[in-house]
A protein has these predicted regions:
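Extended beta-strand/beta-hairpin segments
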Residues: 1-22, 33-118
Length: 118
């Protein structure tokens, strides 16, 4: 993990919020692959295009805005001969089934359970 140079990093790899987007896309891809046969869906290729809005001024304490993403958008790309309506219904299933998406949509209770000094 890294951060851009203007945030003190070297910009050599993805930052944690980019990893969050990757986790969402990877989870959706796994759901698509795992459940396609049960939905009688075939595709040659599948990928997710993701982007999100994040104001770094919140993280930096420069503005009273949320520290994390305000919105995440994604497009599911199928290379398939299936009808568009069938793929749209399957995309909705993927969106509703993905555990990472569920965490982002419904929130997760984060609990600091202690501090350890090693």
């Amino acid at each position: 993990m890294d951060e851009p140079e203007d945030l003190g990093g070297t910009d050599a790899s993805m930052n944690p919020v980019e990893a969050l987007l990757c986790a969402l896309g990877a989870c959706q891809t796994i759901v698509a692959s795992a459940f396609a046969p049960a939905h009688d869906i075939t595709f040659e290729e599948f990928h997710i295009e993701l982007e999100g809005d994040l104001d770094p001024d919140g993280f930096l304490g420069l503005a009273d805005v949320r520290n994390g993403f305000q919105e995440i958008r994604f497009v599911m790309h199928f290379k398939s001969n299936e009808p568009k309506e069938k793929l749209e219904a399957f995309a909705k299933f993927i969106e509703n089934t993905c555990p990472v998406g569920d965490c982002l949509t419904n929130g997760v209770k984060l609990v600091l359970s202690g501090v350890a000094i090693d």
